[in-house]
């Protein structure tokens, strides 16, 4: 892959490798083959020999061809005779039956075709031959020559055929043909050796060789790609790309498994050896190094399946091949290719094989460790999958080297670690998606999948045991409200989904769980386990599993699983009989329904009798059910007893429970419901108002809930009349409680669009209840496409529906999830309208600035969307808004402005719909004064003329401006113009001059102006106010503010020409004008209309709307109807000018379920808060929160997340810098009853006293330690019961709180508290970083020896910093850089041992995950910070590398920096300039004078055989089992009395107890005291080593002639050589994985600047 073999090296001596001894020592094999002039001369001589041999071979071929031609001529004559006989027979038949001319023609054509085919078969390829030329043989190809090889060929025949193929290749003229032929020959040979190997293996396992020959051969086809088809890895696809067409044969005796002769057996072995020898002798000729390694390793692994007598012979040949391949490493191909294949291999028990593979295996493991995140890489998934960073595509925590997840081998420590993680996810109430994301990143191997499934199964067993011990012997009856039932219910849902997706081995679960014991030592006897298993029996795979165990039935038992399940039944007399009956009956009845065997049914009856099953108890439930389901119930089961009974019925008889609930939802109540309407008259529907109890919905089986959703959708969309509000709320809550996609059931109906009422009901439910579900399911893109299709297909005539869709788009656009940016197809054509497009751009800016977007390529389509929006309506955001945009969006707007030749400093509305000038409006008013003064009493013809005149965009934009000027100049009052504008905007005026059209039934007349046009008119009108009236009208601005506010209120609330949302959005889009805040203040906070609507909330108890949310208010619909009946703002109306009666603009008034004018105002409130911060307007900020805090708390879906994002986005705003106490106003938007539990005690004390000294006096370190420690404890993997203290209120888990996960909630509260602190960023940054500074090297040892931070604390800090705003980032990065510099400087005297090393043949992991060195947790902290931080902050990693660069003096220090950078490198994208920049920074460090000299001197010392000249290699310390920081892995240090604490190596005064504790908790270095002293005084200072090596005093311990020093220096050189090797491997690796040509060019340019010895390691990089 890396190597382009020169032409002069393609012909290699055939016998170059034949003289390698089979028993040669592995350590002597790896000497490189030098490139010398002698070798080139030999190659030229051998080329001449090949030519002579080829000429001889051609002469022999010509003789053979002549003989074949003679034989073919004889065969042709025989065939011609046969053909003549056939023709004579056909003529006789034709004479007997006459034929038509068509049949004669067909017969002649068939005869000609047969003759052509015969000629082609006799002489194919005879081009240019005359008619009398005898037929010639077909030209030979590689395939035709290779076909001569079959399973009956001898070894010598195989060798001759392969050499003949090779000679044929040399006869080709084109280099391209030669290359193709070489690849073909290698593929044929590789595949055929696999075929022979599999044949030998098959014969060896089914036959016994004897001395009696009994063979008879027949040619039968056989697949030659047997082994390669079953193999894994990338090489298998390469080798198996072309299969051999050779036909092979086996004897009948072989197929029957009878004895065969030893001669035949040996012939097959020699045939295989000949092919392997040919491949070995032509390694350089083919240049297929990676494929050759794969062949050898794969066959070595399979050789263990052969009989013992022949294993040695096969292994020897393969081992010689493998040694020959590895002898060319770094000569003909880079070591990186060997690393990739070795990493995928399984180990062999042979010591020779281990000695050969181990260096490469360990080297591959070291590179894999470098590319992976440090230490707790997997625990980051626990937080990363759940916290609100929205990392939808995480960095690979596993082995990037082999492009596969970690190999789950027999190492139980590693498996238990991942099992613990899954258990932790289950405890967080996580769905199966984070679990799949954790363990299934591109898994292809079925074996690996089974191991992962086993790990998940162990996690479910662990979770089951946790619940069993937490709630021992819980009864099923009367516990429906207890936390135990809710936790079991939640886990049963998770367990069901895992089983449904095939992620749990149920058989393993049952068998293993039956072997477990409770904490008190008793066996498991709990009916909850039986109920847990019973729920999964409806899954098809589970049905199949139990059916397999129901086949063999006898009098005692059937199968082994069912008795194990029944062993969990608790039929103790002290246990309630009803509880055991429920679980037992539930399980056995479901088993019974899956079988038709009468013996099994009888056996189930017998089992029930054995358990003293009491059918009378169920008869009692049955009687209750029969009586209840015929009753007419105003409400559906409200008492706890009835809910418990119904839950039992739904689990035992699910169909009847479903049907009864659906029947009740559809028409279960005779109560009449009147929706809001016009004039107090609205649509009347019969149904129920309140939803059913949450307990009923939660206790339904999953099957019932899914069925209920499907049936509800059908009733919702296909019903002619509107559905009841209780039914719709039941549907929404069921969707919340049932994980799964929503869009397939709802949005497919939008395409029909023939019933407006159900579509409006869906829009209402999605806007207020299901939007969060769609976002979590990543279905928001589907929703936006569906809504856009509705709007683009045809104008929506129902303006009420159109405005509801506008509100849904607004709400979706201001809270985009990060996954929507990945939906690339949507951005190229997305258009949500004038106002919503601008909201989308603002939301994108927040996402880029706040969230940890994966890489720069993810936002590549966003500029396309911005460009399209700018073209359709060129709008520039104000300077105050652009100030907070990320740089990438600022540059986009600057570029678009330059393309339109606009001034980038001009922050006015640049819309193409320019407002009319004031002079033009006044002129139009003068001309139409007499007409408009009549108002709505105009004649029909006059109204029609006006409508036609104002239908065009320009004139329609002019109309509203004219009306405002009339009112402003007091010429025509609004009560005259209002009704006329209503009729012109909302109705087509039809006169009486067309009576013939009225005789036919007509559809409602289309609107004169659509809602989209009204939005544009609103925007133009606001522009007219700011750009024309405020500039050119002589009226004072104070009076203008009041007139504008009055006109807007009348247009919105009295005449409903405009909508409140569109007017506010248009005003907020003009934040560049200084009068906008004043108008907004007057309009929002001084107008009586809005104040009256806000006062509605005071009619209820003062704490009602604060104590709960509309999402869990069963009486919400009643309150909402009361509001809409009092303030009918959502139904567009017109006023009849004659009767002055308000009428609807449309025949159909759509039912309103959730909306009102104030609830739809909540997204606008968030925008106003943001604008007030941008404009540094504290008065507007305070007024907005004080006026709207109650409805905001009641209606808003995600308060905590929204407040947190706002504080982060605007953290460095002038408003909060000058008035930091204003941030505390956000607390008014939260639930006041939860504040004490939400924040820390110190912060709560500060809120009560308002004295900041309550926090500062405590100290930043103590304050943040108290704040973050609870989160670190929750993230600790070692505590599986960490969530036991939390009460799972399941009915609130999905719908009633913003964040359902307790870990998410805790993290969010910590972030919120830090952001609300009225303290500067430096104080916060220093306090947080101080939690990492557990040592001060300037103090004595006794003052420095403090326990290091836990890994979960470091992880929590890194994630908290990544979420906190950029201002804090700018404060803490210099601190962390300085601390890392100090540790790197100190590390010159520490052990540069590689971290997380792997033992050969297995993985070792730091399971306890203890960190004892400061540099450990700084690596860990910085890695995860840059993994999660927002995209723009990622570039600061370049600055960190630049600042650290001057301190890099040795290889170990560079390796530490590389450990930080390499796992995060993928976040820079695969084809970006940022990737080139960070890589350039890292590689140029290697060219610095000090480090390059250090590397060069180290390589020279290695060449001088420092390691090899040591007398006793056993005395040299084995560094494989040490990690990076001097910790020994996998060794028992109980016998070592030395304290290895890094703080003080010479400490002898420590207490023995402390030393014992240190030994128990942490792994320690296995150095002696003297070794430590010398090691620490010399390591890392190469000049010091060179100085010591020049000493001539033999008694000097630093003399290079001192044996002890030589051994120590050998250790250091070996460690440095390992680090240098890993750095080399990393450079090869990044060159492989980033196919970006500018990147590769820059990499090669820098590599060429390396010094000679180091540069020689990259000969194969090109």
Curated annotation (Swiss-Prot):
Where is this chain's protein located in or outside the cell?
A: Nucleus
Gene Ontology cellular component? mediator complex; transcription regulator complex
UniProt biased composition (Low complexity): 95-124
Primary location recorded for the protein, binned into one broad class: nucleus
| Annotated segments matching region Disordered | 1-24, 95-139, 206-252, 1530-1572
Q: Which keywords are on file for this protein?
A: Activator, Coiled coil, Nucleus, Transcription, Transcription regulation
InterPro entries referenced in this protein's UniProt entry, alphabetically: Mediator_Med23
Q: Which residues form a coiled coil?
A: 39-122
State how it assembles.
Answer: Component of the Mediator complex.
Q: Please report the name of this protein according to its UniProt entry.
A: Putative mediator of RNA polymerase II transcription subunit 23
What organism is recorded for this protein? Answer: Dictyostelium discoideum (Social amoeba)
The opening ranks of the lineage are: Eukaryota, Amoebozoa, Evosea, Eumycetozoa, Dictyostelia
């Amino acid at each position: 892959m890396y190597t382009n073999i020169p032409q002069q090296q393609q012909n290699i001596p055939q016998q170059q490798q034949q003289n390698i001894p089979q028993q040669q020592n592995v350590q002597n094999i790896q000497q490189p083959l030098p490139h010398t002039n002698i070798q080139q001369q030999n190659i030229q001589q051998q080329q001449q020999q090949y030519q002579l041999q080829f000429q001889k071979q051609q002469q022999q071929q010509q003789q053979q061809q002549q003989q074949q031609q003679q034989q073919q001529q004889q065969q042709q004559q025989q065939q011609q005779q046969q053909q003549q006989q056939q023709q004579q027979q056909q003529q006789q038949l034709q004479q007997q039956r006459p034929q038509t001319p068509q049949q004669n023609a067909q017969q002649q054509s068939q005869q000609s075709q047969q003759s052509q085919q015969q000629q082609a078969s006799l002489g194919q390829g005879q081009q240019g031959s005359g008619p009398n030329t005898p037929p010639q043989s077909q030209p030979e190809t590689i395939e035709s020559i290779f076909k001569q090889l079959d399973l009956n060929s001898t070894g010598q025949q195989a060798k001759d055929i392969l050499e003949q193929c090779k000679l044929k290749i040399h006869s080709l003229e084109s280099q391209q043909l030669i290359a193709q032929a070489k690849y073909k020959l290698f593929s044929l040979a590789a595949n055929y050796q696999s075929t022979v190997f599999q044949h030998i293996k098959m014969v060896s396992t089914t036959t016994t060789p004897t001395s009696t020959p009994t063979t008879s051969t027949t040619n039968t086809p056989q697949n030659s790609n047997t082994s390669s088809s079953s193999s894994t890895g990338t090489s298998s696809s390469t080798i198996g790309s072309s299969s051999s067409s050779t036909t092979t044969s086996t004897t009948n005796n072989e197929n029957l498994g009878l004895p065969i002769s030893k001669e035949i057996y040996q012939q097959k072995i020699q045939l295989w050896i000949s092919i392997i020898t040919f491949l070995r002798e032509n390694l350089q000729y083919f240049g297929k190094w990676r494929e050759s390694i794969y062949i050898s390793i794969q066959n070595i692994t399979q050789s263990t399946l052969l009989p013992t007598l022949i294993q040695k012979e096969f292994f020897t040949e393969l081992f010689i091949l493998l040694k020959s391949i590895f002898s060319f490493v770094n000569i003909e191909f880079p070591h990186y290719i060997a690393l990739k294949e070795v990493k995928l291999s399984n180990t062999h028990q042979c010591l020779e094989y281990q000695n050969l593979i181990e260096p490469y295996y360990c080297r591959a493991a070291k590179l894999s460790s470098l590319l992976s995140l440090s230490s707790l890489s997997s625990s980051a998934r626990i937080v990363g999958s759940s916290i609100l960073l929205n990392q939808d595509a995480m960095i690979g925590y596993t082995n990037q080297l082999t492009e596969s997840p970690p190999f789950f081998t027999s190492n139980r420590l590693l498996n238990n670690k991942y099992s613990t993680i899954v258990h932790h996810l289950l405890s967080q109430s996580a769905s199966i998606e984070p679990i799949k994301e954790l363990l299934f990143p591109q898994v292809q191997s079925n074996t690996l999948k089974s191991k992962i499934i086993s790990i998940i199964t162990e996690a479910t067993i662990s979770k089951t045991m946790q619940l069993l011990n937490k709630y021992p012997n819980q009864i099923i009856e009367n516990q429906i409200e207890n936390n135990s039932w809710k936790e079991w219910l939640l886990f049963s849902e998770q367990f069901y989904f895992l089983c449904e997706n095939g992620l749990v081995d149920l058989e393993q679960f049952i068998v293993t769980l039956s072997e477990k014991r409770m904490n008190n030592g008793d066996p498991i006897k709990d009916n909850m386990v039986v109920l847990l298993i019973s729920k999964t029996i409806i899954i098809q795979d589970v049905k199949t599993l139990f059916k397999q165990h129901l086949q063999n039935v006898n009098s005692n038992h059937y199968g082994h699983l069912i008795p194990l399940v029944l062993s969990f039944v608790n039929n103790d007399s002290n246990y309630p009989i009803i509880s055991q009956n429920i679980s037992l009956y539930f399980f056995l009845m479901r088993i019974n329904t899956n079988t038709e065997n009468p013996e099994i049914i009888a056996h189930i009856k017998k089992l029930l009798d054995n358990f003293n099953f009491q059918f009378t108890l169920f008869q009692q439930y049955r009687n209750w059910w029969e009586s209840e389901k015929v009753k007419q119930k105003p409400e559906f089961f409200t008492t706890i007893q009835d809910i418990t009974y119904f839950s039992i019925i739904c689990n035992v008889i699910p169909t009847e429970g479903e049907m009864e609930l659906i029947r009740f939802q559809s028409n279960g109540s005779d109560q009449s419901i009147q929706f809001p309407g016009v004039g107090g008259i609205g649509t009347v529907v019969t149904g129920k108002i309140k939803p059913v109890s949450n307990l009923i919905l939660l206790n339904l089986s999953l099957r019932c809930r899914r069925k209920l959703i499907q049936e509800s959708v059908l009733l919702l969309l296909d019903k002619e009349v509107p559905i009841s509000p209780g039914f719709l709320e039941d549907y929404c809550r069921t969707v919340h409680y049932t994980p799964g996609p929503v869009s397939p059931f709802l949005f497919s109906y939008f395409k029909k669009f023939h019933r407006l009422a159900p579509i409006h009901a869906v829009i209402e439910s999605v806007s207020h209840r299901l939007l969060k579900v769609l976002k979590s399911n990543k279905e928001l893109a589907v929703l936006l496409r569906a809504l856009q299709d509705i709007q683009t297909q045809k104008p929506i005539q129902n303006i009420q529906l159109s405005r509801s869709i506008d509100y849904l788009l607004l709400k979706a656009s201001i809270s985009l999830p990060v996954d929507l940016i990945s939906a690339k197809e949507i951005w190229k054509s997305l258009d949500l309208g004038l106002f919503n497009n601008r909201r989308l751009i603002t939301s994108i800016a927040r996402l880029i600035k706040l969230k940890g977007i994966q890489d720069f390529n993810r936002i590549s389509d966003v500029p396309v969307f911005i460009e399209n929006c700018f073209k359709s309506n060129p709008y520039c955001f104000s300077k105050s808004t652009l100030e907070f945009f990320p740089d990438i969006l600022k540059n986009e707007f600057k570029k678009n402005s330059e393309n339109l030749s606009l001034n980038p400093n001009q922050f006015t509305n640049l819309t193409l719909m320019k407002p009319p000038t004031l002079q033009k409006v006044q002129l139009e008013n003068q001309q139409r004064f007499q007409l408009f003064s009549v108002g709505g009493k105009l004649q029909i013809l006059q109204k029609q003329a006006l409508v036609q005149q104002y239908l065009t965009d320009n004139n329609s934009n002019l109309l509203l401006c004219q009306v405002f000027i009339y009112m402003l100049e007091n010429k025509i009052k609004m009560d005259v113009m209002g009704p006329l504008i209503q009729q012109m905007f909302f109705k087509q005026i039809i006169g009486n001059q067309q009576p013939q059209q009225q005789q036919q039934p007509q559809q409602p007349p289309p609107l004169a102006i659509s809602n989209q046009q009204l939005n544009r008119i609103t925007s133009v009108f606001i522009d007219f106010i700011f750009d024309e009236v405020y500039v050119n009208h002589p009226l004072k601005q104070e009076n203008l503010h009041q007139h504008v506010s009055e006109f807007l209120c009348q247009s919105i609330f009295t005449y409903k020409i405009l909508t409140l949302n569109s007017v506010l959005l248009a005003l907020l889009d003009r934040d560049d004008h200084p009068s906008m805040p004043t108008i907004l203040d007057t309009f929002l906070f001084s107008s009586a209309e809005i104040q009256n609507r806000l006062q509605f909330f005071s009619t209820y108890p003062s704490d009602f709307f604060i104590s709960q949310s509309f999402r869990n208010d069963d009486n919400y619909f009643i309150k909402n109807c009361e509001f809409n009946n009092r303030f009918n703002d959502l139904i567009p109306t017109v006023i009849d000018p004659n009767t002055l009666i308000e009428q609807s603009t449309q025949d159909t008034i759509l039912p309103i379920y959730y909306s009102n004018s104030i609830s739809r105002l909540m997204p606008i409130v968030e925008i106003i808060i943001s604008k007030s911060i941008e404009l540094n307007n504290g008065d507007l900020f305070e007024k907005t929160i004080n006026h709207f805090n109650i409805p905001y708390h009641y209606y808003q879906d995600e308060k905590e997340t929204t407040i947190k994002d706002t504080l982060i986005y605007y953290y460095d705003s002038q408003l909060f810098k000058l008035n930091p106490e204003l941030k505390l106003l956000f607390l008014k938007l939260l639930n006041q009853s939860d504040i004490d539990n939400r924040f820390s005690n110190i912060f709560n004390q500060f809120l009560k006293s308002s004295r900041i000294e309550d926090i500062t006096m405590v100290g930043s370190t103590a304050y943040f330690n108290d704040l973050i420690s609870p989160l670190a404890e929750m993230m600790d993997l070692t505590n599986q019961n960490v969530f036991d203290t939390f009460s799972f209120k399941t009915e609130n888990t999905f719908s009633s709180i913003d964040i359902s996960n307790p870990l998410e909630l805790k993290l969010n509260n910590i972030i919120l508290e830090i952001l609300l602190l009225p303290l500067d960023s430096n104080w916060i940054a220093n306090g947080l970083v101080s939690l990492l500074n557990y040592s001060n090297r300037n103090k004595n040892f006794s003052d420095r020896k403090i326990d290091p931070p836990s890994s979960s604390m470091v992880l929590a800090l890194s994630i908290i910093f990544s979420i906190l705003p950029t201002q804090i980032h700018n404060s803490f990065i210099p601190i962390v850089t300085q601390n890392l510099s100090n540790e790197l400087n100190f590390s010159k005297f520490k052990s540069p041992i590689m971290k997380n090393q792997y033992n050969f043949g297995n993985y070792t992991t730091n399971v306890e995950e203890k960190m004892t060195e400061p540099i450990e947790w700084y690596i860990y902290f910085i890695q995860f910070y840059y993994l999660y931080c927002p995209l723009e902050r990622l570039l600061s990693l370049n600055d960190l590398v630049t600042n650290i660069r001057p301190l890099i003096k040795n290889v170990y220090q560079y390796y530490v920096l590389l450990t930080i950078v390499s796992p995060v490198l993928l976040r820079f994208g695969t084809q970006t300039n940022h990737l080139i920049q960070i890589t350039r920074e890292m590689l140029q460090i290697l060219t610095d004078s000090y480090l390059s000299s250090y590397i060069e001197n180290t390589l020279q010392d290695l060449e001088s055989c420092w390691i090899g000249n040591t007398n006793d290699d056993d005395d040299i310390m084995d560094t494989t089992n040490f990690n990076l920081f001097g910790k020994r892995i996998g060794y028992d240090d109980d016998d070592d009395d030395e304290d290895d604490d890094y703080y003080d190596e010479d400490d002898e005064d420590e207490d023995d107890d402390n030393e014992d504790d240190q030994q128990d908790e942490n792994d320690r270095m296995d150095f002696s005291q003297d070794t430590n002293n010398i090691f620490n005084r010399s390591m890392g200072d190469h000049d010091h080593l060179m100085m010591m090596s020049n000493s001539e005093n033999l008694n000097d311990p630093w003399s290079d002639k001192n044996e002890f020093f030589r051994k120590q220096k050998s250790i250091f050189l070996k460690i440095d050589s390992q680090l240098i090797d890993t750095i080399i491997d990393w450079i090869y690796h990044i060159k492989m994985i980033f196919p970006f040509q500018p990147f590769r060019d820059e990499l090669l340019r820098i590599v060429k600047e390396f010094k000679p010895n180091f540069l020689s390691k990259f000969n194969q990089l090109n």
